[in-house]
Curated annotation (Swiss-Prot):
It is an enzyme of class 2 (transferase). Keywords: Cytoplasm, Methyltransferase, RNA-binding, rRNA processing, S-adenosyl-L-methionine, Transferase. GO terms for cellular component: cytosol. Its EC number is 2.1.1.182. It comes from Treponema denticola (strain ATCC 35405 / DSM 14222 / CIP 103919 / JCM 8153 / KCTC 15104). This is Ribosomal RNA small subunit methyltransferase A. SMART domains: rADc (SM00650). Belongs to the class I-like SAM-binding methyltransferase superfamily. rRNA adenine N(6)-methyltransferase family. RsmA subfamily.
Amino acid sequence: MNSGFFLSPPNYDSPAELKSLLETLGFAMQKKFGQNFLIDKKTRENLISFLTLDKGTRVWEVGPGLGAMTYLLLEKGVHLTAFEIDKGFISLLKKIFLENSKQNFTLIEGDVQKNWLPYLIEHGKPNVFFGNLPYNIASDLIASTVEAGVVFDTMLFTVQKEAAERITARPGNKNYTAFSVLCSLFYECKIVKTIPASAFWPQPNVESAAVLFKAKKEFAEYKNFKLFIKIVKALFSSRRKNIKNNLGSWMKSNGYGDKIDLVLERSGLSGNLRAESLALYDFLLLSDIIGHL
């Protein structure tokens, strides 16, 4: 391990050593933050291999925890900004990484969902957005970046496998949701690795998967981004109902009156279709038509 660090990093492959470290420092695992440590070194190295990292590449890491991935990233010479909410981990990360990595490592304390956009506005976008996301915030965080209209060149997130399947689902798939549509607007998304529960400590009750997001070279055109987001969510508001019922109800509640038949006629779509059968283009078309009413 690098002797230049203020506190030597622990053996990230050893649950016993990690547990001992936590107990020695008096840290309590905060279940509300969904902490699970990736103890399989080959998996950690494999995840890094999916990223194009050069010296000076700007990387954001979400939820570094004890710093297992942080250590590997800094070894690559990247300029790393880590977002961590747990006060105990913040204290430890400072002792391990901050003392002699001030030019390459920045630690942002607090809730990433509140901090990422203000930090981006002040410091600009990174090349890579990366993390082993706590299951309880994964979907919300990714959706918030899309809904803000912010597109990263590359994102790689390890999430609950179920969430990964929703992100990468295509029309007609049972896992296809509003979240799938939002992710497909700006990114080509694919599951690059399935990770068993045994690779983590403590073991979660579910499998995980790493999802690679690569920004599309060309984005689909849209006239009103905020309206598009609202309509996607409205169309999936009740999966058992067809698009005429879901969209018609939303239009009446949002000042568009009883014009659903006109919208469907202009779109060429059958009102009997359900949202899970619509492609990205169909959602964009419907939002453009409604935006011109």
